[in-house]
Amino acid sequence: MLTGKHSHANGFTDNTTCVFDGSQQTLPKLLQTAGYQTAIVGKWHLESMPTGFDYWEILPGQGDYYNPDFIMMNNDTVREKGYLTNIITDKSIDWLEKGRDKEQPFCLFIHHKAIHRDWLPELKYLTLYEDKEFSMPDNFYDDYEGRPAAAAQTMSIAKDMDIIYDTKMYREGMKSRLKKAYGLSLIHI
């Protein structure tokens, strides 16, 4: 979304060894040219400092859920006390209310970490369901049964394909469903 290019074309092909090249054209730069104020608060994870933003406060790397550090526009790192989702939301609202020219159009990128693993709740909710067990609902998984296997066979790629899965991500009995749906070798990690 930032450049409108696929990763192989924008040069950022992985999150561990690459550094985003901020000199290329980006959506925030185009918005600035069109008269918009631009800001980003939260997860950046591009190993470079944001360009094309009038204001930014970003997390170093993945960031931490609790008492996270933020890299500020002056390159100082500031530790904030609290839960990351609340902090990002508060910082975003603060910029909307006090940090921008209300007479100008704006685009604010609010990048929450909570949609990324490990999913950790606010501390007050950490033990809320500690002693409870929940069954997986019958409709938890999609019902595209048969479609992946048919597509793989039609494309003649089934013979060269392995499905790699992590048991922490699948409930009991999923191995047999995966094997039945794909008819392929399964590699358990």
What are these regions (language model features)?
Residues 1-187:
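Formylglycine-dependent sulfatase
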